[in-house]
From Swiss-Prot:
PANTHER family: TETRAACYLDISACCHARIDE 4'-KINASE, TETRAACYLDISACCHARIDE 4'-KINASE, MITOCHONDRIAL-RELATED. It comes from the Bacteria. This is Tetraacyldisaccharide 4'-kinase. GO terms for molecular function: ATP binding; tetraacyldisaccharide 4'-kinase activity. GO terms for biological process: lipid A biosynthetic process; lipopolysaccharide core region biosynthetic process. InterPro entries: LpxK, P-loop_NTPase. NCBIfam families: lpxK. The lineage of its organism: Bacteria, Pseudomonadati, Pseudomonadota, Gammaproteobacteria, Pasteurellales.
Length: 328
């Protein structure tokens, strides 16, 4: 939301509610810390990838990157997710590559299709962990989101921030976009800066894209081949990031369409966005919800998180050290 980027009359009017939000959050955190509210400790280490603000900071590409890094090092890893946007009421539930995004959520399906990682969804993180451990011998569990879910004890915390938007106007919800104050970053094990400019102590993450894949045929085509005018759509937390990336890569976008994060789509809704001669580009997260009614001119653009060699070594060494393994 644009009103969260700068201080305005509206944000100042909402500021008292932000103070109330902060007070309730602090009381809740204190109750968990004193064990007056019960929390669950997993038998295996838990690494949480979360954020202190709302709205599309890039957690999913980071989860995919981390899973692939751990799998390459022979670490048995599982992922738990809330399953936002899914309609299912059956919890906990394992997600596989054939799961319907409309039922279990778009992000879990994307993560499983990219990595094949064991993944369970439930609003109750304990249920998800117990289901995974009953089926798979795991060394580590990654929680996709859940930084503020203090009912789950954690061993490692990573926070992703948007390097361009940073902390917006600096206010907590609802006057701003923050769930917690920036001072929270001093207590986490790693701060990941997605795009923009990383501050000292932050690990810069870049999202790279090189090709588009046709939803209907599976054909892969380098983005440099899209020399004609294109239309782009995105139903993610911050759609401008996707559109700006395509423009930086040299694509000519005649029209862009922004949808709500986790929004469900149908054929009628999307059929009129682009003519049959014009490519319609979308995110991979949107594609998992559109494949069963895709048209011939629909393409999705996978993105991959990349880090410097130094950041990769540091991040992986810290995890492997915790697991009692070497980073070779």
């Amino acid at each position: 939301m644009n009103i969260w980027q700068k201080k305005s009359i509206i944000s100042w009017l909402l500021f008292p509610f932000s103070c109330l939000f902060w007070l309730i959050s602090q009381i809740r955190w204190y109750l968990f810390r004193k064990n007056w509210l019960k929390s669950y400790r997993s038998p295996v280490p838990v690494l949480i990838i979360g954020n202190i603000s709302v709205g599309g900071n890039g957690k999913t590409p980071l989860v995919v990157w981390l899973v692939e890094q751990l799998q390459a090092r022979q670490i048995n890893v599982g992922v738990i997710s809330r399953g936002y946007g899914g309609k299912t009421t059956q919890f906990p539930q394992l997600v596989d590559a054939q799961s319907q995004a409309e039922m279990v959520g778009d992000e879990p399906v994307l993560i499983v299709q990219r990595t094949g990682v064991p993944l369970a969804i439930s609003p109750n993180r304990k249920q998800s962990i117990e289901l995974l451990l009953s089926r798979f011998p795991l060394d580590l569990i990654i929680s996709d989101d859940g930084l503020q879910h203090y009912a789950l004890q954690r061993n490692i915390e990573w926070v992703v921030i948007d390097g361009e938007r940073r902390f917006g106007n600096g206010f907590l919800l609802p006057a701003g976009s923050l769930r917690e104050l920036p001072s929270r970053l001093t207590s986490v094990q790693a701060v990941i800066c997605n795009g923009g400019t990383a501050n000292i102590g932050e690990h810069f993450m870049k999202l790279d894209a090189t090709f588009a894949q046709n939803l209907l045929t599976g054909e892969q085509r380098p983005l440099s081949h899209f020399t004609q005018a294109c239309v782009a759509m995105a139903g993610i937390g911050y759609p401008p990031r996707f559109f700006n990336m395509l423009r930086r890569l040299g694509l000519q976008l005649t029209q862009t369409y922004s949808f709500a994060d986790h929004q469900a789509f149908n054929a009628v809704q999307l059929a009129t966005l682009a003519s049959h001669e014009t490519p319609l580009l979308m995110t991979e997260k949107d594609a998992v919800k559109c494949r069963h009614f895709a048209q011939a001119n629909w393409w999705y653009v996978p993105v991959n998180a990349t880090f410097s060699a130094e950041s990769t070594t540091y991040l992986m060494t810290e995890i492997l050290k915790y697991l009692g393994k070497s980073n070779e």
